Amino acid sequence: SLKAALPPAAPQQGEPFDAIIKDVDELIMPGLSHWQHPDFYGYFPSNGTLSSVLGDFLSTGLGVLGLSWQSSPALSELEETTLDWLRQMLGLSPQWSGVIQDTASTSTLVALICARERSSDYALVRHGLQGQDKPLIVYISAHAHSSVDKAALLAGFGRDNIRLIATDEAYALCPTALEQAIEQDLAAGNRPCAVVATCGTTATTALDPLRAIGALAQQHGLWLHVDSAMAGSAMIVPECRWMWDGIELADSVVVNAHKWLGVAFDCSVYYVRDPQHLVRVMSTNPSYLQSSVDGQVKNLRDWGIPLGRRFRALKLWFMLRAEGVEALQARLRRDMDNARWLAEQVRAASDWQLLAPVPLQTLCLRHCPEGMAGQALDAHTRAWAERLNASGDAYVTPAVLDGRWICLLYTSPSP
């Protein structure tokens, strides 16, 4: 193992750089999964373009921190400008304002904190968890990403106040079930607070019906957050925007540019319709960060949890300029075409099954030898996936769907 190969303590004297690189080649690289490999089909697409890698390299070398606008004006202004470019590419209206977080986990946590405070009239900011006499309820799909559940816990809602809403045959959240759950909580004296919908679930790329969910959210005063971490990138392709029809009814949405779009990790873009809720919750203004331009500029420390910020916008800016919108659209269309082709091959094969719709580039499939079912089929699925992953020839992701093991394959292995 790597731990056994490394010394138990740091060297007292510096070592030659060649020796460090030698250890990278001999010790580190054999223990890594190569996410940039052309046959890496696992987890989710996260292939960083060369232009974004170079932008990230420059950002690290510059070493600037976005504590405030004044600490590095170009950092704040490039982020604001670049995210407005991306907003236009996604087809979002000018009412949306963006900020870069690290991952979708943080973006969803920020959204639920904002939802909590708006619902409680900011009582929890003033009085903590004791400032609310009735439980605040969060509604999520049974197929929502695990980060949504974690965000609700970290935001203080409590596991007992998270409602898992049933899905339909396409694994999308059922609005009727959501409405029933809201009515039950109102009857019980609870306070419905937020609903997290998903545009492109992790396991099946299911598309929750945002327009119907948004109508319910507005009717009952719920904050609607949309997790479109992976699928959101597809909205730069105009013919895909039907997938998030109703997005303008949402209060916030997350799109991970470090996934399918091709920006080097990490670069999670969080858009919010009314930034005052975000700023009111996150704002800090110690004397050593104040300047004469406060109130005239966007201080990004008030748009998220950390005080310090990396210059993440630089790698996004590099990629957008080097690639251009048309090339990015062409790459995503290629990936979706490849997924449709592969889905046709799976459907045509008698010993393979396709287990969910393929709206984008994710396939849920299973190899089914004749006469094999149940636990034997589960064991077979896990075994062939593990053999493939161990071979180094390709990488796929085993997962559970409807209580049975399947395999996820993403057809976007290279930019």
Residue ranges and their predicted role:
Residues 1-95, 386, 390, 394:
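N-terminal entrance/gating region of PLP-dependent enzymes' catalytic architecture
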Residues 103, 107-279:
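Conserved PLP-enzyme active-site core in the AAT-like
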Residues 152, 217, 346-347, 388-389:
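A generic structural signal for well-ordered alpha-helical segments
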Residues 211-215, 341, 383:
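Alpha-helical scaffolding segments of alpha/beta enzyme cores, especially the outer helices
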Residues 245-350:
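Active-site C-terminal subdomain of aminotransferase-like
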Residues 354-388:
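Conserved PLP-binding catalytic core of the aspartate aminotransferase-like
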Residues 357, 362, 390-408:
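Conserved PLP cofactor-binding pocket of PLP-dependent enzymes
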Residues 410-415:
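Conserved small/polar residues in nucleotide/adenosyl-binding loops
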